[in-house]
C-alpha cells in the first residue's frame, strides 16, 4: 500500500542486520525493486528466483510486468527458476540458454515420499476410504489458476463410469465455497473430500490412485513433483512445462480437448507403484543434490 515506506523498511532491515545475501522469490518483475532496496542497505549478493511462467492479475498485471521487465534482468547478481520456462519468463527469452539464468529444480526429501503399502492402507482407513474406492487427488489452492471448475466437470464424468470414485481436494482459497456449490449442484458432495491444508501430503499421495492437475498455467508445480516421488500417475494440462515429467508417468492433455479424453486417461491409469528414489537422485530432484547446486550458483558462481 505504501511502496516508498516498504522500500525504506527493506533498506533499514538489511542495513541494521548487516545482511549480505538477500533472496527474492516472485513472478512479478517489479519485485526486483526489493533487491535494489537491499543493495542500498548494503547487500552485495542479490538473488532472484522466478516462481511462475505467466503473470496473474489480468491485463493490468501484464502491463505492469512488461513496464518493469528490465529490472529482474539487471538488478539481481544471481538469477534462477524451477524450470527453463519460468526463468525465461522473468529474466528474458532464452535467459537459460544464453547463460543469464540457471534452473534449480524444485526438490523433495525423496525418502519421505517413497511409496509404502502399509502407509497407504493406514491413510486410506484414516480418510474413510475403502479398498474398492478409486481415489483421485488434487493439491492446490482454490484459485482460478488451478482450474477447479474443470476438475469437477471431469470428476463428474469419472463418477458416472465408476461410482466408487472419490476426489480428495487438498488446500484452501478464495474460490472454495464456489467449488463446493458446483459439487453440490452435481450431487457429488458425498464423493468429494475437502481436506484443507495438510502436513501429511506424502501419505495422501500414497493413498491416492491418480493425481489430476488441470492448471491454466504453472512455473514448475511442486505438487506434481511430489506426486511422482510416490510413484503416483499424473494427468495434467499441457500448459505445464514438459520438464515436470521426471517419472515418465505423466500424461499431458489439452484443456480444449473433449472432456472424455481426460476421463479415459484417468480411468485407465496403471495402478502399479514403483520406487522412484534412483530416478529422482539421477535427475537431481532430491533435496541433497539441489542444495549443492544452489550453493554453487548462489554463493560461488553468480550470474
Segments the model singles out, each with a brief description of its role:
Residues 197, 216:
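Aromatic "clamp/platform" in nucleotide-sugar-dependent glycosyltransferases that forms part
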Residues 22-43, 55, 65:
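An aromatic- and histidine-rich active-site surface loop
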Residues 272-303:
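A charged, aromatic-enriched C-terminal amphipathic alpha-helix characteristic of glycosyltransferases
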Residues 114-129:
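A short helix/loop element that forms part of the nucleotide-sugar donor recognition site in Leloir-type
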Amino acid at each position: 500500500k505504501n511502496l516508498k515506506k516498504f522500500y525504506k523498511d527493506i533498506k533499514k532491515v538489511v542495513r541494521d542486520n548487516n545482511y549480505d545475501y538477500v533472496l527474492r522469490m516472485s513472478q512479478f518483475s517489479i519485485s526486483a525493486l526489493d533487491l535494489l532496496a537491499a543493495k542500498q542497505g548494503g547487500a552485495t549478493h542479490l538473488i532472484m528466483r522466478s516462481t511462475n511462467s505467466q503473470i496473474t492479475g489480468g491485463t493490468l498485471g501484464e502491463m505492469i510486468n512488461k513496464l518493469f521487465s528490465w529490472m529482474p534482468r539487471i538488478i539481481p547478481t544471481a538469477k534462477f527458476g524451477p524450470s527453463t520456462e519460468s526463468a525465461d519468463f522473468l529474466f528474458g527469452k532464452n535467459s537459460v540458454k544464453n547463460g543469464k539464468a540457471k534452473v534449480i529444480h524444485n526438490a523433495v526429501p525423496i525418502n519421505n515420499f517413497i511409496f509404502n503399502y502399509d502407509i497407504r492402507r493406514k491413510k486410506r482407513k484414516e480418510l474413510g476410504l475403502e479398498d474398492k474406492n478409486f481415489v483421485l487427488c488434487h493439491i492446490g489452492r482454490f484459485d482460478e489458476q488451478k482450474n477447479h471448475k474443470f476438475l469437477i466437470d471431469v470428476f463428474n464424468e469419472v463418477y458416472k463410469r465408476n461410482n466408487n470414485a472419490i476426489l480428495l481436494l487438498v488446500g484452501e482459497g478464495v474460490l472454495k465455497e464456489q467449488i463446493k456449490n458446483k459439487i453440490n449442484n452435481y450431487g457429488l458432495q458425498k464423493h468429494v473430500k475437502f481436506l484443507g491444508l495438510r502436513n501429511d501430503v506424502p501419505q495422501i499421495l500414497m493413498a491416492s490412485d491418480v493425481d489430476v492437475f488441470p492448471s491454466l498455467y504453472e512455473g514448475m508445480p511442486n505438487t506434481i513433483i511430489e506426486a511422482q516421488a510416490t510413484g503416483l500417475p499424473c494427468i495434467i494440462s499441457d500448459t505445464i512445462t514438459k520438464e515436470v515429467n521426471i517419472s515418465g508417468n505423466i500424461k499431458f492433455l489439452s484443456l480444449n480437448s473433449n472432456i472424455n479424453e481426460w476421463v479415459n486417461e484417468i480411468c485407465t491409469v496403471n495402478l502399479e507403484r514403483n520406487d522412484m528414489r534412483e530416478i529422482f537422485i539421477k535427475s537431481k530432484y532430491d533435496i541433497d543434490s539441489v542444495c549443492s547446486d544452489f550453493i554453487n550458483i548462489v554463493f560461488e558462481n553468480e550470474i
